[in-house]
Swiss-Prot record:
Membrane-traversing stretches: 9-29, 62-82, 93-113, 129-149, 166-186, 227-247, 269-289
Sequence ranges assigned to domain ABC transmembrane type-1 in this UniProt record: 93-290
Designated gene of the protein: dppB
Protein name: Dipeptide transport system permease protein DppB
Family named by the database record: Belongs to the binding-protein-dependent transport system permease family. OppBC subfamily.
Biological function: Part of the ABC transporter DppABCDF involved in dipeptide transport. Responsible for the translocation of the substrate across the membrane.
C-alpha cells in the first residue's frame, strides 16, 4: 500500500511540475503587458521591469520563480502594489473552500437521496424527474445555472441577497448553483448501484429473512451503493474547482476564483501563476485521496 501511495504521489508531483512549467511559459507568450499605462515613460517602464525581475533572461526568471515557489514565495502582484500574492490567496482561499465544501455536501446528500428514490421507483415519474435534473446538472454549465438562479430567486422573487459574502443567506444561491454538478453525478451513480444491489442475492436473502423493505433498502442496498461512491471525490472536486471560478464572479464572492478572473485581463502574471498552482495542488490532493480510498475498497487497483 505504501509503495502504491508513493508511486501515485510521484506521478502527481511530476504533473505539478509540468503544470508550473507550462503555465509559466504560457504567461510569457500572452499578448500585452501588465505595465501598459501610456503615461509611463520608457525609463519608468524599465525600472518596473527591473523591480519585478522581468529584465532577466527567460530561463533565469523560470528558475528564480521555481526556487521561490518551494519557499511559499509567489512574488508580489503587478496590479496591487507591494501586495504579496500568498497573502491575497490566503485571504480569499477560505471563502472558496467554504463555498466548495457546502456545495459538495449539499450535492452529495441530495444526490444520494434522489438516487435512492429513483432506484426504488425505476422508470416511474419520480425517476424521470430526477433523471432530467441529473442530465441538467451534467450538461448545463454551473455559471448558466447560477445566472438563472440569480435572476429567478434573487431578482424576481427577492428571496436571497444577490451578491456578497458574510452571512449564511448570501451563500445559499451560489451553493445551490455549484451543487448541481455533484448532485447529478451522485444521483446517477447511486441509482445505478442500487438497481444492481436490489436484484442481488444478498438482498433476496435479506427479504427472505423477513426484514422490512426500509431495512433492506437503507441498511443493505444503500450502504453498499455508497461505499464505491468514494471514488467520485476526485471528479466532483474537479467540477467544483472549475465551476466555482465563474460562480464567484457572478455572485460577487471574494474568493480566489473571482480574483483569478480579474487577474487575467489585467495580465497580473504572479496572481495567475499562483492561483493556477493552488488549484492544481487542491485537485491533486483530492485525486490522491480518491486513489487511496479506491485502493482500500478495491485492492486490485494496486497491482
Amino acid at each position: 500500500m505504501v509503495k502504491y501511495i508513493l508511486k501515485r504521489l510521484g506521478l502527481l508531483l511530476l504533473t505539478l511540475f509540468l503544470i508550473v512549467t507550462l503555465t509559466f511559459f504560457m504567461m510569457q507568450v500572452m499578448p500585452g503587458t501588465p505595465f501598459s499605462n501610456p503615461k509611463l515613460t520608457p525609463d519608468q517602464l524599465e525600472i518596473l521591469k527591473h523591480a519585478y525581475g522581468l529584465d532577466k533572461p527567460l530561463w533565469q526568471q523560470y528558475f528564480i520563480y521555481v526556487g521561490h515557489m518551494f519557499t511559499g514565495n509567489f512574488g508580489t502582484s503587478f496590479i496591487y502594489t507591494n501586495q504579496p500574492v500568498i497573502t491575497m490567496i490566503a485571504q480569499r482561499l477560505p471563502v472558496s473552500m467554504q463555498l466548495g465544501t457546502q456545495a459538495l455536501i449539499l450535492g452529495t446528500v441530495l444526490g444520494a437521496l434522489m438516487g435512492k428514490a429513483s432506484a426504488r421507483r425505476k422508470n416511474g415519474l419520480l425517476d424521470g424527474i430526477f433523471g432530467f435534473l441529473s442530465v441538467l446538472g451534467i450538461s448545463v454549465p454551473s455559471f448558466v445555472i447560477g445566472t438563472l438562479i440569480l435572476l429567478y430567486l434573487g431578482f424576481n422573487l427577492n428571496l436571497f441577497p444577490i451578491s456578497g459574502w458574510g452571512t449564511f443567506s448570501q451563500t445559499i444561491m451560489p451553493t445551490i448553483a455549484l451543487s448541481f454538478a455533484p448532485m447529478a453525478v451522485v444521483t446517477r451513480f447511486v441509482r445505478s448501484e442500487m438497481i444492481e444491489s436490489l436484484s442481488s442475492d444478498y438482498i433476496l436473502l435479506a427479504r427472505a429473512k423477513g426484514l422490512s423493505e426500509k431495512e433492506v433498502v437503507n441498511k443493505h442496498a444503500l450502504r453498499n451503493s455508497l461505499i464505491p461512491m468514494l471514488t467520485l471525490i476526485g471528479p466532483m472536486a474537479a467540477g467544483l474547482l472549475t465551476g466555482s471560478v465563474l460562480i464567484e464572479k457572478i455572485f460577487s464572492i471574494p474568493g480566489i476564483g473571482a480574483q483569478f478572473v480579474d487577474s487575467i485581463p489585467a495580465k497580473d502574471f504572479p496572481v495567475i501563476m499562483a492561483t493556477t498552482i493552488v488549484y492544481a495542488v487542491i485537485l491533486m490532493v483530492f485525486i490522491l485521496v480518491t486513489d487511496i480510498l479506491t485502493a482500500i475498497v478495491d485492492p486490485r487497483v494496486r497491482l
